[in-house]
Amino acid sequence: MPIYDLIIKNGIICTASDIYAAEIAVNNGKVQLIAASIDPSLGSEVIDAEGAFITPGGIDAHVHVDEPLKLLGDVVDTMEHATRSAVAGGTTTVVAFSTQDVSKKGPSALAESVKLDVDEYSEQTLYCDYGLHLILFQIEKPSVEARELLDVQLQAAYNDYGVSSVKMFMTYPGLQISDYDIMSAMYATRKNGFTTMLHAENGDMVKWMIEALEEQGLTDAYYHGVSRPSIVEGEATNRAITLATTMDTPILFVHVSSPQAAEVIKQAQTKGLKVYAETCPQYALLSDAITRCHHHGEVESYGVGIDLSSISESPFTNPDDRFIGSKYICSPPIRPEGTQKSIWKGMNNGTFTIVGSDHCSYNYYEKTSTASKHRAFDPENNKNGEFRYIPNGLPGVCTRMPLLYDYGYLRGNLTSMMKLVEIQCTNPAKVYGMYPQKGSILPGVSDADLVIWYPDDSKKEYNSKPKLITNKLMEHNCDYTPFEGIEIKNWPRYTIVKGKIVYKEGEILKENADGKYLKRGKSFMCTPKNEWVTEWRPKYES
């Protein structure tokens, strides 16, 4: 008689710290038992892993959904689309963003901003659990009183909705926040144990560079990257570390792309500072050749470890179409060839604590009443495809796990499969207050969020196993993927969320979708050192 909801047999469990052959029993959405052998008759459902890896479900803590006109366009994925795409690629938890609603005032203002999003997403079919970060871009009272009010607002957001992380921007008109306000925010995030996230680019440098390029008529998509050179990211990173050191506040840099920024981060970590960082697959795998070739009409290499000759649907099919490069515009930008090795190095040596996707999906063939191809083309408003009008962002929540499995683990750019689990599953859970419920495989404690991959060494042919990345495979609402046509050697065979199979051999099982809003705890890693550079102390430390 069955006593377990699900049994997984003949698998190789891989966690952040160990790899071993074992079998797993699941009950009531939790990992119930791990043993060398489990009687299959005890399970209502049984999966034979056939010697493949079983990993914790991936955690993508950098996902943008439902964001209208934030950065020049509409993000086309709802939370439903994003979670569907996530599970198709082995991610079982996403953390998206709730942008501060500046019309809300008073102690509950931030909690009310979160409530708007939670209420909206509760009406959608969700394929996995999700959490929310807060995007903070305006301090209600730009004065000493601001930090005290923000303290109360953060407490309310945590108590009501389990939000324990705040993101701020050092660039983008309308979102860029001053150093003064960053310090005020750090005052409050430190007190409340929030993870402080920063998009580090010097916004004033970017603004100046954009205007200087436009003055010379250099406005193709390629020049987006030229306007945001590595030094722009490096300067802002160094400045943010200085602010954080002054405030004794742990910080996490999101989507780091620059070797210069990575070096500054590693130096701070070597000094014992509480500095963490996230990078993304696009910075390890793509190079700016993908935009440069359209600008110069040349076909060059795609990036590190990716052979264009094997790509069936080459992004370089029409090198004369300079606007195709807009498919690869993100901020920070994809960097020149040769820099990607430093990103892999950072994943292996601890510079990068986590890997997120920065999923931010904009349609390439978006049309408006006055635009022939894209919102960036709007002659009535003097828009002719200039890079300043192209939305910044790439879809990527589905490809994050498989790309690092193949181009990281299988091809030797990551030191081990355990490293993949550490930076894609376990560390995100620890950094963002979800461990050990998420990001681990611990009996009686962890949610049964699991990924069963295809066997790597099997000679058996699996018709459901993809060989190339295609947009159809993504299960998102976007009309392209930047990795179209790229060879892929493995892919999730089964994605299991809280004990239910939601993705099986290429098929989404909508009837098993049961994602919920996830209230998070405080970070396991982002705790202050209680070391100060001056005699000043926050009042709450007095």
UniProtKB/Swiss-Prot annotation:
UniProt keyword annotation of Cell division present: no
Keyword field: Hydrolase, Metal-binding, Zinc
Cofactor note: Binds 2 Zn(2+) ions per subunit.
Top-rank lineage group of the source organism: Eukaryota
Binding site for Zn(2+) 2: K167, H199, H255
GO cellular component: cytoplasm
Post-translational modification: Carboxylation allows a single lysine to coordinate two zinc ions.
Coiled coil location: none
Cofactor: Zn(2+)
Record-linked CDD domains: D-HYD
Modified residues (N6-carboxylysine): K167
Induction: Up-regulated by dihydrouracil and N-carbamyl-beta-alanine. Detectable only in cells grown on dihydrouracil and N-carbamyl-beta-alanine as sole nitrogen source.
GO molecular function, one term: metal ion binding
Binding sites annotated in the UniProt record for substrate: Y172, S331, N392
Binding site for Zn(2+) 1: H62, H64, K167, D358
Protein's job: Catalyzes the second step of the reductive pyrimidine degradation, the reversible hydrolytic ring opening of dihydropyrimidines. Can catalyze the ring opening of 5,6-dihydrouracil to N-carbamyl-alanine and of 5,6-dihydrothymine to N-carbamyl-amino isobutyrate.
Protein name per its UniProtKB record: Dihydropyrimidinase
Species this protein is from: Lachancea kluyveri (strain ATCC 58438 / CBS 3082 / BCRC 21498 / NBRC 1685 / JCM 7257 / NCYC 543 / NRRL Y-12651)
Lineage of the species this protein comes from: Eukaryota, Fungi, Dikarya, Ascomycota, Saccharomycotina
Gene: PYD2
